Swiss-Prot record:
This is Hibernation-associated plasma protein HP-25. The keyword Lipoprotein does not apply. Residues 29-96 are annotated as: Disordered. Its main location: secreted.
Length: 215
């Protein structure tokens, strides 16, 4: 019996102290909650973490503005020098300082102002086409107390006609025409007045022609 009482007392004492500790802990928690203080300031940032993995490529953005011009590049080497072929030439200018000869025949001019290519025949008064192409032909007439009627002919066909008369004064008349010629075509001036109709006074006639461009 005494042994049983002792064991019962020991168990009762242990339960008593457990109860005391539980109450004490509960009271301490209650006091801590009632007397809590505000949190302190944030601490300094921690060190950076290690870089993460690269993300997926983003969508294509709009085009940007043009960039500034670049600096000029170095000067290139000189190009090759080639000899250009000379342009074909055909020209003449002739003059007559007297009354025209008999009508309806080529006027034979006495003075060659230019005939370097030799395409105008001074003996016959005719220009012979050597270089086919487009030509400009013209004549210039100066009169004093005289009259003329001149026509420009091509292979026997009249192309242009000019009439001028100066009684007691000087007069100036001129004419020109552009036409295409083939090789061998002939061009000349001829008078339509008889020599007796224009023998008095002074007459100067200049006849000229030149190639504009070849065919």
């Amino acid at each position: 019996m005494p042994a049983q009482r002792g064991g019962a007392l020991s168990m009762g004492a242990a339960g008593f102290w457990i109860l005391v500790l539980s109450i004490t802990s509960a009271l301490a928690d209650s006091n801590n909650q009632g007397n809590s203080e505000p949190c302190g300031p944030p601490g300094p940032p921690g060190p950076p973490g290690i870089p993460g993995f690269p993300g997926a490529p983003g969508a294509l953005g709009p085009p940007g503005p043009p960039g500034v011009p670049g600096i000029p590049g170095p000067q290139g080497p000189p190009g090759d020098v080639e000899k250009c072929s000379s342009r074909p030439k055909s020209a003449f200018a002739v003059k007559l300082s007297e009354r025209p000869p008999e009508p309806f025949q080529p006027i034979v001019f006495k003075e060659a102002l230019y005939n370097q290519e030799g395409h105008f025949n001074m003996a016959t008064g005719e220009f012979s086409c050597v270089l086919p192409g487009v030509y400009n032909f013209g004549f210039d007439i100066r009169l004093f107390q005289s009259s003329v009627k001149i026509r420009l002919m091509r292979d026997g066909i009249q192309v242009r006609e000019k009439e001028a008369q100066a009684n007691d004064s000087y007069k100036h008349a001129m004419g020109s025409v552009i036409m295409a010629l083939g090789k061998g075509d002939k061009v000349w001036l001829e008078s339509k007045l008889k020599g007796t109709e224009s023998e008095k006074g002074i007459t100067h006639i200049v006849f000229f022609g030149y190639l504009l461009y070849g065919k």
